[in-house]
């Protein structure tokens, strides 16, 4: 059997098991309502938390940047690809995050790849929450460090693993956790993690992709939310969710950022963000710096939708953020529920095994500051209608 036939067989297996990903194409900009294949639907599955992906200020900033700086950076950051606008973004992000310095890279995924293998190796131990993001898992693999996986949000389990790492005489101990876990919307027990890190002389790294622009003062993230900015050694952020653009960043002490500029492969061997992306991200940072109006609107919407859907009889688990997992449990019924939502004009994705454990299938609803009360009421009415028709209510 040749290579391509093998690929066809693998794709067929995915299709037969119901795991083949279907990619829908948007025919409009991101917004509360979007067009997909000629159909107008309420968007309840994007990460556009604050509605900045099609914001006029960001678009104007991007257009002006193209006029002034061109469309591409032309090189990697260390040769001729660092423009003044890149440094302006990094400075503003550092001010916003209340840290000494930041480093912007091509994506949040790349940010984890830039940090983890650069600061750890075979002599070190990495303590990772079992539900951490794929980019963390891959970064840990690349580092070749010893792995100590602790049970999700279980501080007793973390301490047990720290004791093991200490017995193994690890040179460095790096605790890594997501800030907000994207499937359930729960947040990391950061105060307890920091306390254990001090006790066992470990570093703390938080990937706050879903916390940036959502938690903390003006959306500064989970470290600010818990007033622990000084205690967290490394924060990873993304510019593609609440910030509405694309890219990732690393926030921390200047010496860390200086070291990453010398050694981090994703920084050294990839071109920098385009001027348009950089300018738009800078404008998004300014908007968050200036006002918390969008963050407040996001939370008002989330609290309204979550309270109403719980009153309806749905289980939304232990979410602590606008991420709302509407539990259906049964895989087949969850997929059918998602299809019926789409027929009724709502785009909300089904999350099933293996993304989540068997029997934990859900519709993951992503609330945005762009949603109006009428939008949310429309969605609630459809959840009630479909729930009754499928017997999930």
Swiss-Prot record:
Pyridoxal 5'-phosphate binds at residues 108-109, 182, 207-210, 238-241. The keyword Acyltransferase applies. Belongs to the class-II pyridoxal-phosphate-dependent aminotransferase family. BioF subfamily. This is 8-amino-7-oxononanoate synthase. Pathway: Cofactor biosynthesis; biotin biosynthesis. Substrate binds at residues 133, 355. Keywords: Acyltransferase, Biotin biosynthesis, Pyridoxal phosphate, Transferase. PROSITE patterns: AA_TRANSFER_CLASS_2. Its EC number is 2.3.1.47. It comes from Petrotoga mobilis (strain DSM 10674 / SJ95). GO terms for molecular function: 8-amino-7-oxononanoate synthase activity; glycine C-acetyltransferase activity; pyridoxal phosphate binding. It catalyses: 6-carboxyhexanoyl-[ACP] + L-alanine + H(+) = (8S)-8-amino-7-oxononanoate + holo-[ACP] + CO2. NCBIfam families: bioF, gly_Cac_T_rel, PRK06939.1. The modification N6-(pyridoxal phosphate)lysine is found at residue 241. One of its GO terms (biological process) is biotin biosynthetic process.
